[in-house]
């Protein structure tokens, strides 16, 4: 509003109520960020001793309200206009009876977008199906055959193929190497590492199959349990090689590494939670906030300029270009 200065001139005056509201909004945001960063209520009261919003009950109410907004923001984002070629799925363990499956979409221009998550008692088929059903309803549609990177769960693979029957499913090499290593004597770790290093650097179907065959023979001579672990995955560990995709994309697409990095950031923010209440939206609030924060730090995929070559490999021989990025 404007206030007369006694003459012809007047000056702009900020209402005290406006300043108070603006200050309150800043304090709310600061409290929210401090909460998810692990700052205790006591320390927050030291930062804002005059604010009534730093009482334990006020902080709790604020988190319930603002956290619910984050869930809405997370699941309300428009994704139908994006040009997705891939989907990465992995589970994050919260407690003995609470797990979340997280989906990250990969676009034709190399961006990574946290799409959604589903919380359940375990990484079971219903949880995975609910997640993918919601993505379909929201408009998730790959530009060609879907390329999916999975942590190794048969449940995840089954759900992906139920929704996208012609999807290419790549098994995470890091997870599989770790499981095979657990079956071997330590003296064989070095050789195992070398085989997987060769896979991570390999280009094309012929080289991929050759290394897979050598790895299989190596494990057959060392430990039958390790061999069984490899055969459980089968050629899913060389799915990217089998479609002759550019090796420049190996770092990004042969493991669930960048989703695991997201989980580390989320766990860091959720570390102060001592008890998860499955009867509330507590887990959803923390996941929505943590994943959105993690997404802020995402960079383009390594080798992203070669993604169009991959998409071309993913198209069926008789399939015309369905959607073209501008």
Placement of each model-derived feature along the sequence:
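RNase H-like nuclease fold core
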Residues: 1-21, 26, 30, 50-149, ...
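N-terminal alpha-helical segment
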Residues: 27-28, 192, 208-211
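Short alpha-helical segment immediately N-terminal to, or the first helix within
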Residues: 33-37
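Transmembrane alpha-helical segments of multi-pass membrane transport proteins and ion-pumping complexes
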Residues: 38-42
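DNA-recognition alpha helix
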Residues: 43-51
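Short alpha-helical patches at protein termini and domain edges
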Residues: 46, 59-61, 154-156, 170, ...
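Conserved beta-strand -> loop -> alpha-helix junction used to position metal-binding or nucleic-acid-contacting
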Residues: 117-119, 145-155, 159-196
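Acidic/histidine-rich catalytic cores and adjacent linkers
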Residues: 201-326
